[in-house]
């Protein structure tokens, strides 16, 4: 396989078809590349679970990177029924990059190591479930002016790399809707199989879940909420864990997915004269990329596939 973040998870997707049990340890090692702010290291080290921040020390965040781990874990769960993997304790990656690549931790150096520590200097470990929640919730809150997830460095189409300030990927916002819904479903199955009504999560992550005061319609509010969380874990974290109801987590994930679904349907169904499709992107000027421009159709296949597969497109829209 390759040596990048997507390659790790997509290789596992293929290996799961042949040897699901053998992929478990591999996936847990991969989660050690996730930072507490939901971003991840992008260069793979020589040993399992070893990561390097970025090539040539150039900070870059791909907005789709948090999507692939859950997709892979979901297939593993379907293949094996081994929901105990969600309880597996895994460390987090730590380096100079903080606040989702927007700031630098000047107090960190290589002597501190590349594992997130708590205030007592102990390496902190969180469950695989905690890693998944952080990745997908942070993506939900990092939105552009049209309230879709920011494109940042690019999504899985690496050519879409010239819109770091105002670009948004509606296509992968659709993908994250699917993640949130399926993660909620997995949590409910986990609760039944493991007979666990609650899970332990870092107290910082508990605050990320408790967003009742956030107006989802307000992009600035969502970004401010995300920044407060990212700042709370940019150096050391408390190391304190709290019990959280599995049912409440699942309900919160569905609530976010429902809002995203309605928002995309309301704002991104474009076209004219009885022919419509979904816009999938905004460029660095904040303009819709797809639609009917001066009588010329602009449509990307990715946008249509992701809107259909995620369930954003309803039956009538899918027929169109």
What feature does the model see in each segment?
Residues 1-320:
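Acidic, mature catalytic/reactive cores of soluble proteins
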């Amino acid at each position: 396989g390759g040596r990048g973040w997507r390659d790790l998870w997509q290789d596992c997707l293929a290996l799961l078809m042949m040897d699901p049990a053998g992929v478990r340890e591999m996936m847990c090692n991969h989660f050690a590349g996730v930072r507490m702010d939901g971003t991840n290291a992008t260069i793979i080290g020589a040993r399992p679970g070893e990561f390097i921040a970025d090539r040539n020390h150039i900070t870059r965040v791909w907005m789709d990177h948090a999507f692939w781990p859950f997709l892979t874990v979901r297939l593993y769960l379907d293949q094996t029924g081994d929901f105990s993997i969600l309880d597996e304790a895994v460390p987090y990656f730590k380096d100079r990059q903080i606040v989702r690549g927007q700031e630098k931790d000047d107090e960190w150096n290589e002597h501190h190591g590349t594992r997130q520590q708590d205030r007592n200097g102990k390496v902190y470990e969180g469950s695989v479930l905690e890693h998944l929640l952080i990745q997908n919730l942070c993506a939900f809150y990092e939105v552009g002016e049209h309230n879709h997830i920011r494109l940042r460095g690019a999504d899985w189409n690496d050519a879409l790399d010239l819109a770091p300030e105002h670009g948004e990927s509606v296509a992968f916002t659709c993908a994250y809707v699917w993640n949130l819904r399926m993660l909620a479903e997995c949590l409910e199955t986990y609760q039944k199989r493991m007979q666990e009504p609650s899970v332990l999560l870092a107290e910082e992550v508990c605050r990320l879940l408790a967003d009742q005061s956030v107006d989802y319609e307000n992009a600035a509010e969502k970004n401010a909420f995300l920044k407060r969380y990212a700042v709370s874990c940019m150096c050391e974290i408390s190391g304190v864990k709290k019990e959280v109801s599995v049912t409440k987590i699942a309900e919160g994930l569905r609530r976010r997915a429902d809002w995203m679904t309605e928002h995309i349907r309301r704002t991104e169904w474009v076209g004219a004269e009885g022919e419509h499709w979904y816009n999938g992107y905004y460029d660095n000027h904040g303009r819709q990329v797809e639609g009917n421009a001066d009588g010329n159709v602009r449509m990307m296949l990715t946008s249509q596939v992701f809107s259909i597969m995620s369930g954003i497109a309803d039956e009538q829209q899918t027929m169109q």
